[in-house]
Curated annotation (Swiss-Prot):
Stated name of the protein: Bifunctional protein FolD
Organism: Shewanella putrefaciens (strain CN-32 / ATCC BAA-453)
Entry keyword Transit peptide: no
High-level lineage: Bacteria, Pseudomonadati, Pseudomonadota, Gammaproteobacteria, Alteromonadales
Pathway terms, separated by semicolons: One-carbon metabolism; tetrahydrofolate interconversion
Keywords for the protein's UniProt record, in alphabetical order: Amino-acid biosynthesis, Histidine biosynthesis, Hydrolase, Methionine biosynthesis, Multifunctional enzyme, NADP, One-carbon metabolism, Oxidoreductase, Purine biosynthesis
Functional description taken from the UniProt entry: Catalyzes the oxidation of 5,10-methylenetetrahydrofolate to 5,10-methenyltetrahydrofolate and then the hydrolysis of 5,10-methenyltetrahydrofolate to 10-formyltetrahydrofolate.
GO cellular component terms listed in the entry, alphabetical order: cytosol
Oligomer and partners: Homodimer.
NCBIfam families (alphabetical): PRK10792.1 (NF008058), PRK14186.1 (NF010783)
Length: 284
């Protein structure tokens, strides 16, 4: 068996095209164009790349894109005051603060300062809680994008045994909630997990988000399983690879996401979907 590739790049482009059409329809109906504010603190190269991609995608679909680049040594209060002003700005539907933040700024304080109805990253405790209660509104972008990828396979998720490797607040934990909502029996693995191989060998669906190149051997993958690889790791030779050993995994899986071109584009597409959702549901 050779796995079918889940083409995140193509699916994300399809979503962006639909969003662009919706923005055009809003304009023609005399409605406001959605607005997204993106805040970058410092000059971390990876963060600059991510932020640049988000701003470009925003403009591609016709959203208003506002950029705020703050110095690494900006104070926590300066950042919180900027968020307060954007919370009160009626032209802004979504506020995104690129993580990680410098050590002197507390992530949780910043995330909780963003109004829940403008939290298009889906990180605010209110929005995570809504997902936990099975009534999601603004959902965490990467898990939301992954659910779109899984849906594209046509596989019925109800009753599947799913394993999530990684328990971060950004991916692993909300991913577990998304899979529960989709009817999976879900196991979340982390650094204290015993018998990881055994758990993965039994899984119908595997989502890996640990940030370690080739962490999961491909031969662990159960024949016919769906493999979602969230990792994006740059090797010394410049090659980008995922957290799963791709070639071997593709021999066992029924569907697999490539790296790059799998989950990454979907995270940004989901961010744009959340921004339009916020405009329509909360701010029109």
């Amino acid at each position: 068996m050779t796995a079918q590739i889940i083409d995140g790049k193509a699916i994300a482009q399809s979503i962006r095209t639909k969003l662009s059409e919706k923005v055009t329809a809003r304009k023609e109906a005399g409605q406001r164009v959605p607005g997204l504010a993106v805040i970058l603190v410092g000059a971390d190269p990876a963060s600059q790349v991510y932020v640049g991609s988000k701003r470009k995608a925003c403009e591609e679909v016709g959203f208003i894109s506002r950029s705020y680049d703050l110095e690494t040594n900006c104070t926590e209060d300066e950042l919180l005051n900027l968020i307060d002003s954007l919370n009160d700005d009626p032209t802004i539907d979504g506020i995104l603060v690129q993580l990680p933040l410098p050590a002197h700024i507390e992530d949780s304080k910043v995330i909780e300062r963003i109004r829940p109805d403008k939290d298009v990253d889906g990180f605010h405790p209110y929005n995570v809680g809504r997902l936990a209660q099975r009534i999601p509104v603004l959902r965490s972008c990467t898990p939301m994008g992954i659910m779109t990828l899984i849906k594209s396979t046509g596989v019925d998720t109800y009753g599947l045994d799913a394993v999530v490797v990684g328990a971060s607040n950004i991916v692993g934990r909300p991913m577990t909630l998304e899979l529960l909502l989709a009817g999976c029996t879900t196991t979340t693995c982390h650094r204290f997990t015993k018998n990881l191989e055994q758990k993965i060998r039994q899984a119908d669906l595997v989502v890996v988000a640990v940030g370690k190149p080739g962490f999961i051997p491909g031969e662990w993958i159960k024949p016919g399983a769906i493999v979602i690889d969230v990792g994006i790791n740059r090797l010394d030779n410049g090659t980008l690879v995922g957290d799963v050993q791709y070639e071997a995994a593709a021999q066992n899986a029924s569907f697999i996401t490539p790296v790059p071109g799998g989950v990454g584009p979907m995270t940004i597409a989901s961010l744009l979907e959340n921004t339009l959702y916020a405009a329509e549901q909360y701010h029109d």
